[in-house]
Every structure is written in C-alpha cells, then in structure tokens.
Amino acid sequence: MRNTELVQWFRQSTPYVNMHREKTFVIMLDGNAIAHPNFINITNDISLLHSLGIKLVIVFGARCQIDELLAKNQMSSTYHKHIRITDSKTLEVVKQAVGGLHYDIFSRLSLRLPNSPVLNVVSSNAVLAQPLGVIDGVDYGLSGKIRRINIEGIQQQLAQDAIVVIGPIAPSVTGEMFNLPFEEIATQIAIKLKADKLIGFCDQQGILDSEGNVLSDLHPREAKRYLTQFIESGQYHHSAARFLQASIEVCHAGIKRSHLLSYKEDGSLLQELFSRDGIGTQLSEESSENIRLATSFDIPGLLNLIRPLEEQGILVKRSREQLEMEISNYTIIERDGIVIACAALNHYPEEKMAEMACVAVHPDYRDSSRGDVLLEAIKRRAYKLQVEKLFVLTTRTTQWFQERGFVLSTTDDLPKEKREHYNYQRMSKILILELSQ
C-alpha cells in the first residue's frame, strides 16, 4: 500500500473506530477457519479490535477436527436432523478436538505484536447444557442444547477488559458434558448480551449471487432463501449456512447487523468493519444507507462532500454560515453515518417553482443510482409544496438531467429573484422539469 493510500484509508476508517468503540461483537469461528493458514492474521486483527476498545466474545466450533479424529480412530458418527448423535466414545473425541482448538486460539491470541499489551483472554463456563433426549425415537445421547447462560458472568469478564472464548461443549447440572452446536451458542449469547454485531467466517467472501458476485447487503427474507438453497444442496453444515441460521435469528431478536467474511483473505475483518462499503455480506433488516432531511449536525459532512466540487468549479461556493441558514433545504443520503450525497430544494412560492441545487454525490458512488434517489426525494418534497416546475442550473451535467425529463430553458423562465441573481460569468445551463400534480 502506498503512503497516500494508507493515509486515505486511515482517514476513512476514523469514523468507524469511534463508532465501534465500547460496542460488543460476538465472533463465530468454525473449525475450518481455525485450521486455515490465515487464522494467525484473523487473530491479529481480533487483537487489534480489542485494542480499539471493542468488547469481544469468541464462540468456536470443531466439526471438521472432530471428523478428522474420528476417521483417524476408525470411528464414525451418525446424524439425525443435521445433529451429530454423540455417545460416550464420540464425546471423548469431541473433548480432544475442542481442547486442541481451545489451546490454539489462546496461543494465537497470546502472540503479541511489538509494543502491544498482553491480552486478557479467558475461557468461560457460562453455558449450562441439558440433553436433547429422544426425538422421533432417536436417542441423541450426549448431544445437548442450552439450558442456561450466565450472561452476568460474561458481562463481568468483558468489563474487566477480557476477550471471552467459549467452545461447543458444556456441562449439565449433573456434571455430564454435552456436545452442542456452536452456532446455537453464538446465537443465544449474542441475543442475551444484546450484542451490536455477530460476525462469521466462511470459505468465500460472503454470500454470492447466481453470477458469483458478493451480495454486500442481505435482508433476512433473502437470507432464508439462500439458507434453503444450502440445505437442499446437502450443505447444511457449510460455514455460510450455519452463519445464516444464526444471523437470521439474531436479526429477528434485535441485533442490528451481522457480517459474513472470508477466512481465507488477509484483512477481511478490518476491511469489513472500517470501510464504508465493506468487503463481505452484511445482513440487516435496516439498510446501511438512509435518506433524510439534513440537520445542523450534518454540516461538517456536507462541507467535506461539496468542497472538492466547489474547488473544481462544479458547484458554487457556499460558506458554512450559508449552509447553517439553509440547512433545512437539504436532503442527504448517509451511509453508516457518513454523508455520501446531497441536494437542496430552494422554494419560490410566488411562481410555484423550486430549484434543485447543490447536487453532489461522493466519487465512490457516482456510477450508482444515488443521483436518481436524490431526484425522487426532491420531487416528493416539491409535490408537498405544490411546486409546478422544478429547475436546475448546471455547467457539467446537462445531459443527465435531460435524460430524466428536464428541458433546456432560458433565464426568462426563471423566478424573478433567481433571474436577477443569475451569474452570467458561469453561464450555467438552465433546465426545467414540469411536475404533474
């Protein structure tokens, strides 16, 4: 990365550093992620998150390691309704696999970068299990489910600046150990902690569409469809499927966002959390973008957006004081709290006209539909004001407005006040759109 790119990325990431501080994230790590060579980088990035003041709970699984040990010992296990039936011999293998991963996670998190503090990593026995019992005539043996979670204990450990690590085996009130699905543990801990995010890893960079493109945003309804596809294709235990199952449930329970990333790509965790568009799939009932009326709190973001365009002569220069006076005229699109597009509606009630002014879209989004979204929002505001004609003055985007129904006009067609202040040095093109009421 060149120095300029590093500086640009660091500046862009700063709002997210502040946004995530003191938040609680639950991270799902299955056995495939832990076994991959990139896991050392994932743990380094987890350590970095902790150093930035993020509270972390790691819930890990061990399915592939259990399968390997069973095969090595010439043992097999059966499944019923996608759940492993665990007898006493199988449980010993499960303990061995889980214990090994537990040690790996602790040792990796203990590897410090130069001049970095020692991490406080703790193993939690906060989960109390109970047997699944007999279902449909099938005895699940030592396969269990959650009976209770000591959330207060986890909260105390997080308050003491610890990273909490929880595995997929847990004791019952009788002292027996049970094998639990790790996604169920992650789901319930995230819900009961009221975590801010659930984060999972798989072998691809999120959920892919039919053409192999990463879906950056996914609604729970769509997530259910992709989960069904995994199940119907016999991939119920695929990392992405298990994450979808967990994320759909936590989303319905009020966890605002879940993120699915690749465990193969170095830095995917940081890119997802500290960049505007991320790199994986975000699952949320709410869009990461919001279109709304601007307030005085948005003025710094508006200035950052329009200043480069003013310096290029594309927009007329506006002072901070002018923005403060006219802020109620502005409609903005924000993404993760960052203003990425704006437009103002200046009303001329006597002529039943209004101007769409100060139209700006962040360079990263100019090839998208944000301009159209702004135009529709401005038109809706104009309709409410009973505006009959919407006009724009532009030096660079004449064709864009013409493609959307605006017609070239002259200064004679402008409202009297606007006509008297028309800047003949800029010689902006005048375009008018008739609004049908």
From Swiss-Prot:
EC nos: 2.3.1.1
Catalytic reactions on record: L-glutamate + acetyl-CoA = N-acetyl-L-glutamate + CoA + H(+)
Q: Which family does it belong to?
A: Belongs to the acetyltransferase family. ArgA subfamily.
What PANTHER family does UniProt report for this protein, alphabetically?
AMINO-ACID ACETYLTRANSFERASE, AMINO-ACID ACETYLTRANSFERASE NAGS1, CHLOROPLASTIC-RELATED
* Annotated InterPro entries: AceGlu_kinase-like_sf, Acyl_CoA_acyltransferase, Asp/Glu/Uridylate_kinase, GNAT_dom, NAGS_kin, NH2A_AcTrfase
Pathways involved: Amino-acid biosynthesis; L-arginine biosynthesis; N(2)-acetyl-L-ornithine from L-glutamate: step 1/4
Compartments where located:
Cytoplasm
Taxonomic path = Bacteria, Pseudomonadati, Pseudomonadota, Gammaproteobacteria, Pasteurellales
Which stretches make up the N-acetyltransferase domain? 289-429
Q: Predominant location of this chain?
A: cytoplasm
Q: SUPFAM superfamilies given for it?
A: Acyl-CoA N-acyltransferases (Nat) (SSF55729), Carbamate kinase-like (SSF53633)
Q: What else is known?
A: In bacteria which possess the bifunctional enzyme ornithine acetyltransferase/N-acetylglutamate synthase (ArgJ), ArgA fulfills an anaplerotic role.
Q: Does the keyword Transport apply?
A: no
Annotated protein name in UniProt: Amino-acid acetyltransferase
Which is a GO BP term held by this UniProt record?
Answer: L-arginine biosynthetic process
Q: Which GO terms describe its cellular component?
A: cytoplasm
